[in-house]
């Protein structure tokens, strides 16, 4: 019975990840909140330290399911070896990949080098300093307001850049710098990159699409780092990870993949007719609710 309940919980986590990873509303923020109300007990019998390590890994690694959805849905566009593509189309695909790689450098530097330097200097990594409810709420609200402001500012302007292929390397780097902001929980990786793109006048569909592609190296890299860290912890502690813990992780990842397919299709259809402002309103409301719920518990 306990195993069944944990699997049901993992399905819920997968659904939330699949929806919120691609909508600009912060998947990490939602998973933090979900863990507050619906804790996975899969690893808690092995102690608080192990449970914390497991959940930290779980919340990142299930993103692999979500990112696989992007690869599947945009495989034709992302595959430079497709025999049906002309030489010019193949060059355009390689150019897109180079832009994605270049745009990923700032976030990779901050996420790996900056995190290590901070931990060495203070004894705590970035998560240790900013991973809390107040930070999540503040980020939700601040970026919600920014979405509304930028969408209003761009309302009467045509998209200067109508496709991802038209994004320049300079613009790609600018958008990549915005991705570094997502290191703050509650910001939203997709939200920060979409904001950066919209500030440059990139059309909504192109901004969303480029954000999806930027997620591939970012999320694969983060998952590998977290996964390695977890296995290193398990190796040093000598803890035997229960089979249920792996089953729960696998189920959540598969569900995240399936739900992501729907969420991506929804967002691409939505932004062809509407602005990102409704997501800004949602973020502000959610941020306020987080403050109302958590502040009394912290006093």
Predicted regions located by residue number:
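Multi-pass membrane proteins that catalyze or facilitate reactions on polyprenyl-/lipid-phosphate substrates
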Residues: 1-299
């Amino acid at each position: 019975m306990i195993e069944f309940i944990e699997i049901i919980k993992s399905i819920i986590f997968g659904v939330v990840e699949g929806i919120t990873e691609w909508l600009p509303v912060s998947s990490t923020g939602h998973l933090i909140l979900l863990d507050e109300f619906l804790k996975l007990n899969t690893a808690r019998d092995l102690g608080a330290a192990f449970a914390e390590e497991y959940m930290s890994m779980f919340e990142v690694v299930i993103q692999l399911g979500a990112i696989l959805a992007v690869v599947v849905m945009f495989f034709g566009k992302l595959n430079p070896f497709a025999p049906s593509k002309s030489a010019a189309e193949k060059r355009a695909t390689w150019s897109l990949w180079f832009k994605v790689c270049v745009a990923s450098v700032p976030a990779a530097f901050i996420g790996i080098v900056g995190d290590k330097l901070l931990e060495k200097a203070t004894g705590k990594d970035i998560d240790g300093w900013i991973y809390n409810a107040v930070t999540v709420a503040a980020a939700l609200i601040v970026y919600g307001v920014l979405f509304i402001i930028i969408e209003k500012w761009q309302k009467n302007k045509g998209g200067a850049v109508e496709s991802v292929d038209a994004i320049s390397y300079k613009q790609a780097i600018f958008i990549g710098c915005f991705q570094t902001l997502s290191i703050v929980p509650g910001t939203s990786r997709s939200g920060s990159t979409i904001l950066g793109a919209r500030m440059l006048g990139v059309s909504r569909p192109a901004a969303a699409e480029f954000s999806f592609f930027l997620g591939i190296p970012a999320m694969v890299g983060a998952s590998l780092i977290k996964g390695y860290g977890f296995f290193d912890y398990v190796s040093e502690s000598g803890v035997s990870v229960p089979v249920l813990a792996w089953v729960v992780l696998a189920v959540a990842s598969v569900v995240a993949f399936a739900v992501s397919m729907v969420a991506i299709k929804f967002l691409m259809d939505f932004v062809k007719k509407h602005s990102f402002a409704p997501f800004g309103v949602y973020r502000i409301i959610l941020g306020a609710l987080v403050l109302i719920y958590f502040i009394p518990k912290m006093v």
